[in-house]
Amino acid sequence: MLPLVATGHAAVAGSPALCYQGVNLSGAEYGDRNGVYGTNYIYPSERTVLHFAAKGMTIIRLPFRWERLQPRLGAALDANELKRLSDSVALIRKHGMAVLLDPHNFGYYDKGQVGKAPATNAAFADFWARLAVEFANREGVAFGLMNEPYDIKATDWLKSANAAIRAIRIVGARNLVLVPGTVWSGAGSWEKDVLGGANGTVMLGVKDPLDNYGFEVHQYFDVDSSGTHESCEGADNAVKAIAGMTTWLKQNNKRGFLGEFGVSSEEACVEALSKVLKTMGDNGDAWLGWSYWAAGEWWPPGEAYNVQPQNRRERPQAVALNAALDPKVAASSDCAMVKPATN
């Protein structure tokens, strides 16, 4: 698995520090496939990227729409959209942060579920082969296979994930791959048989010849873990979920990445957020890191989880995130970028 550096005040003795701590910059996943750039969707501005880099964050999860990048399954990537994505990656890397590429499609291409025609596993693998070629072995670029597959059986999703990983490796890309589970890839349900087997059992079948992968999970703090409520009745469950996921990762010698999590500015929510951050910070042997949901220029100012800078004032959630960062890690050449596997 990707090596981490054993530095940083947040790590317990013998535990590496978290290298990858950042945010999702939402915007490129907005709208439908026919959306107009600059009108219906955007990519991050340098001002926003610079803000989070200056805080000491080390990774940006970058959502985008599969259909816009590849308008026809099995065909070439759209040159204009690929350039926008590539330019955004270059901008983020310019400011010293890693990038997690995130096709934000919930396990679908248009209305076709991954694994079924027309979005077959072969089509999914073809997409990843084409995208992987563009970013193969670039330091600072990791591949998130898919955002939140939710209604695919775990056993079926495993086949899709393995097909994509196989395609990525066949084209010679050694980049870190982050693999979600099904059922929204929830940390709290990871070991529960919700749909076609538990992620925590089925996804142990992931096959990567380079063994350069981790599992991406998501966890929200509201009553139903959906990330759609301002209150946080599920805060205790969220804290327990991350603790449980930590145990599972250690027992199975795996690495995890918390790709989405968010809370409102309510005091109890922020307190729970800090507990989750501490759990991960204390267990760098299990966690690669995290990316908070979310920020982005077009996020409504009143959106409860929003940490986009406004009027030069930091929201309480952002203060908690900043407190979890270690400037020594951000400055470390070993932690500033996702390195391709060398084996």
Feature roles, as predicted:
Residues 41-42, 126, 133, 137-142, ...:
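Extracellular glycoside hydrolase catalytic/binding regions
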Residues 1-6:
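Bacterial N-terminal signal peptides
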Residues 62, 259, 293:
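The conserved SAM/SAH-binding core of class I Rossmann-like methyltransferase domains
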Residues 8-13:
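Boundary at the C-terminal end of the N-terminal hydrophobic targeting segment
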Residues 275-343:
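Extended, alpha-helix-rich binding/interface surfaces that flank or overlap catalytic cores
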Residues 72-74, 112-115, 269-272, 302-305:
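Short secondary-structure transition/capping segments
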Residues 15-200, 211, 287-288:
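Active-site mouth of glycoside hydrolases
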Residues 26-27, 181, 218-219, 294-296:
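Residues at the C-termini of beta-strands that transition into short coil/loop
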